[in-house]
UniProtKB/Swiss-Prot annotation:
Summary of the function given for this chain in its UniProt record: Transfers and isomerizes the ribose moiety from AdoMet to the 7-aminomethyl group of 7-deazaguanine (preQ1-tRNA) to give epoxyqueuosine (oQ-tRNA).
Catalytic activity: 7-aminomethyl-7-carbaguanosine(34) in tRNA + S-adenosyl-L-methionine = epoxyqueuosine(34) in tRNA + adenine + L-methionine + 2 H(+)
Superkingdom: Bacteria
Gene Ontology molecular functions: S-adenosylmethionine:tRNA ribosyltransferase-isomerase activity
Gene Ontology biological process terms in this record: queuosine biosynthetic process; tRNA wobble guanine modification
Enzyme category, top tier: transferase
UniProt subunit comment: Monomer.
Xref: NCBIfam families: PRK00147.1, queA
E.C. code: 2.4.99.17
Listed name of the protein: S-adenosylmethionine:tRNA ribosyltransferase-isomerase
The gene coding this protein: queA
Length: 357
């Protein structure tokens, strides 16, 4: 398929630049994959779509304050965006204004430039930085000097609401530079109501990297190579999925990152033995892919021509997805990270859809 097949015109007025103050009050579009029927609700109504005995799986990654600033030895300012924490003292990061930065270069951070970092390696467009601090770890340093990086399309200044509302209420494991945005709509009362209904809830971890915002630069989408991200799916989650399906329950993934984590685990040798899956994944899911685990997906409305809308098309069907997005635009749903949500069920015929546009 061509990249242009996933293009659509989105009025700027439908891009949400601010979060919902009450998470679960955002709008919810429900679409059933096998019929294409659409219903308009509020997110707290999602409890009506999920049954006792179903299993919801969420991504418990926590966004780190991954953006901070420093000075080169020459005095020039740089902006650092952490891609991954590599160890106690090492990070992998992109650096703006990186001219003349090479292996061995020194960068100074923090109050009065007291924190020294050295560039010890260059990997593609990323730099590995070693912090010389003998007291604080890399994550401690980042927590002290960094700020939460909002998506690049949000140009306004960050505020106190962002610090809280650009994290999920169930965050646990630090490592993402972007929030798993489908999970932002869940608040504690909704999670409690689902639990009281008999819905099982469990977690995976996929640390979202900067690649989630990178555009596809190929005309034919099959030529695109996905960025790599760290993922953990525990043996207990794998066992719980198998047990749920055996009893006739459904697996509901919250977010494309959760779905990608589960499919990555399924395709590994760990799945059949129900062993912990801890690895990196660059799985690219696009139309034609046969889904193996997830029965329903909760997700936001995504960018045109993004890998995320391609995943949705693979799950819901191309024609269903484009119809849903057109309907969302007509009905003035909010788009992107702080926008509204979809609850979609798997269309088992999607892999066999006629892709002649």
């Amino acid at each position: 398929m061509q990249l242009s097949d996933f293009s659509f015109d989105l009025p700027k007025s439908l891009i949400s630049f601010h979060p919902y103050f009450i998470r679960s009050t955002c709008r919810l579009m429900v679409m059933y994959g096998h019929t294409g029927m659409i219903f308009h609700k509020r997110f707290f109504n999602i409890i009506d779509e999920i049954n006792s005995g179903d299993l919801i799986i969420l991504n418990n990654t926590q966004v780190i304050p991954a953006r901070f600033f420093g000075k080169k030895e020459s005095g020039g300012k740089v902006e650092v965006l952490v891609e991954k924490i590599l160890g106690i003292n090492n990070i992998l990061a992109s650096i703006k204004n990186s001219k003349n930065i090479n292996i061995g270069s020194k960068i100074f951070f923090g109050y009065k430039d007291k924190i020294k970092g050295s560039v010890v390696d260059c990997k593609n467009s990323f730099f590995e930085i070693f912090f010389h601090d003998n007291i604080d770890s890399a994550i401690d340093i980042i927590n002290n000097i960094g700020e939460i990086p909002l998506p690049p399309y949000i140009k306004r200044f960050r505020n106190k609401l962002d610090v809280d509302l650009y994290q999920t209420v169930y965050k646990k494991k630090t490592g993402s530079i972007a929030a798993p945005t489908a999970g932002l709509h869940f608040d504690l009362p909704l999670l409690e109501a689902l639990h009281n209904k008999g819905v099982d809830i469990d977690y995976i971890t996929l640390h979202i990297g900067s690649g989630t915002f990178q555009p596809i630069r190929r005309v034919q989408i099959e030529e695109h190579i996905m960025h790599s991200e760290s993922v953990e799916v525990s043996s207990s989650v794998i066992q719980k999925i198998k047990s749920c399906k055996k009893k006739g329950g459904r697996i509901i993934a919250v977010g494309t990152s959760t779905l990608r984590a589960l499919e990555s685990a399924y395709r590994s040798s760990k799945w059949s033995d129900s062993k912990d899956f801890i690895s990196d994944t660059n799985i690219f899911i696009y139309p034609g892919y046969k889904h193996n685990i997830v029965d329903a997906l909760i997700t936001n409305f995504h960018f045109p021509e993004s890998t995320l809308i391609m995943l949705v098309c693979s799950f819901l069907g191309y024609k269903n997805t484009m119809n849903a997005y057109n309907t969302a635009i007509v009905n003035k749903y909010s788009f992107f990270s702080y926008g509204d949500a979809m609850y979609i069920t798997h269309n088992k015929l999607a892999p066999y859809e006629n892709f002649i546009i």
